[in-house]
Amino acid sequence: MKRILFIVLFAIVSLNAFSQDVIKFLGIPIEGNKKEMISKLCEKGYEYDSESDLLSGEFNGIDVFISVQTVNNRVWRIAIVDENQNSDETNIKIRFNKLFDQLSNNSKYELADGSKLEDSEDISYEMVVHKKRYDASFTFKDKSIHGLVWYMIAEQYGRYGILMFYENLDNAANGDDL
């Protein structure tokens, strides 16, 4: 009897050790199909426009568009883009650094790559002349979550905005289609 109990207990512990949690966006697991994800985001108050295939609403205090991106009809990434990319260089640096601090100070995440921007950084010059990309990426402290949260500065006609991504790396393209 002890032996059977030990085997059952060992099997349960082994399964738990290999189970993986899924990255979430607004508490919604990034998995399943696109229609389900859009429906769940609409339940959170976002509005879906079928013509543009985008949702709109507020995220982290900013009006944004949200794109649900799939691979083989499985959701793998949520892309968030500022609705109005109208920040000047000073304000986008402040916003970039604020996001960096928010993610760095969140107990769920750890920095994978990137750093805060210095006040003296001339992002306009660096982006145009040297094609520099300003981004930061964070992984999960809980290693059972195979996901990535990252963001970058986007420039359009001298105005700036933030592009942010929540990625379920288990659902990302892995070359199976090649």
What would you call each of these model-derived segments?
Residues 4-17:
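Sec-dependent N-terminal signal peptides
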Residues 7-10, 65-78, 90-100:
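A signal for specific C-terminal beta-sheet/loop modules enriched in small/flexible residues
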Residues 11-14, 57, 147:
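Small side chains
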Residues 20-53, 83-178:
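Non-cytosolic coordination micro-motifs
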Residues 41-81:
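N-terminal, post-signal-peptide region of Sec/Tat-exported proteins
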